[in-house]
Design a protein with these regions (language model features):
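Basic/aromatic-rich interaction segments and small domains that mediate binding to polyanionic partners
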Residues: 2-67
Length: 67
């Protein structure tokens, strides 16, 4: 997977394991990236275009669309 950096644009590509997931296809801008190395502990802060607030985890289904 391409490294994620602050300022990158990301898109949700599948169902997230969350009771109130971000809808598939939603895009946002990476605001911060945690310093954890594991795919299961890495956290990515995103400002979602729909106004929602929910971090991405490294194992969530998403792609970097521009950066």
């Amino acid at each position: 997977m391409k490294p994620v950096r602050v300022g990158d644009r990301v898109r949700v590509t599948g169902h997230m394991d969350d009771p109130y997931p971000i809808p598939v296809g939603t895009e946002g801008t990476v605001d911060w990236v945690g310093q954890w190395n594991s795919e299961y502990t890495r956290q990515i802060g995103v400002k979602w275009d729909n106004g929602r607030s929910l971090i991405l985890l490294g194992h969530d289904p998403f792609e970097v669309v521009s950066g």
